[in-house]
Amino acid sequence: METKVLMNITKFVANSIGHWRSQRSAHHLAFGHFEAVQSEIDIIALPHDDPAVIDLCKSYNIDPQTVVSPFRMTWEGQSDWDDSEIKGTCVLVPIPDPDSPHRGKLLRSRLCRNNRCRGDYYFTEHGTFVLVTAYERAAAEEKIWFVNPNVRCLCVSLIKTSVRFSELLLPHFLQKFARIFRIKLYMTIFKSYRYKLRACSLYINAIALALPCHFFINTGA
């Protein structure tokens, strides 16, 4: 008997559209500092014939007709520790697998220092969205699911590097306040570079639980 998958990319994106006000807290072990970041995040649906969607598809030689539920994410915020500008925007384009609609690829523009990147996604039988993105030296696995229509929770990225070095992965807690409450977890990746420890924040919209952790959801007014 075939297992029924509770979520698909169209429903997932529809549930994610909206304006978010976020508060993210992080503990940077390398510097012994707690950081608080406040930001505003907007996710809006895009038409299939949007020029940004067409250009992103062309860059991967993908037929724009195969696109489902493209959207744009824009964020702007400030940190109580780092004076660097926290601001950006990117276009995300899901491409479902025609033979397996609960799997596919996710094209993303202007993500992390790269002009674009592509990840592979799938939905578990419980409705969890899982995205795996390969980078030059690492691969990030991200997960996200909805506890109910009003709560989206837990985003953690697990980074696996090709370099034999013990990395410290620290999840961040991010609670989204809007008309509905959403929670994400982000993480800071610490790695060795010329025998020094550098901190690198991975800011991704979308995303998941890869490490055991506890979390709490405040659904009050």
From Swiss-Prot:
Keyword Iron (UniProt): no
EC number: 4.-.-.-
Family from the record: Belongs to the CpcS/CpeS biliprotein lyase family.
Top EC category: lyase
UniProt keywords, alphabetically: Lyase
Superkingdom in the source lineage: Bacteria
Annotated organism of origin: Microchaete diplosiphon
Protein name: Putative phycoerythrobilin lyase CpeS
UniProt cross-references to Gene3D superfamilies, sorted A to Z: 2.40.128.20
Induction of the gene: Induced under green light, it is part of the cpeESTR operon.
Keyword Lyase set for record: yes
One GO MF term: lyase activity
Phylogenetic placement of the source organism: Bacteria, Bacillati, Cyanobacteriota, Cyanophyceae, Nostocales
Known role: Covalently attaches a chromophore, probably phycoerythrobilin, to Cys residue(s) of phycobiliproteins.
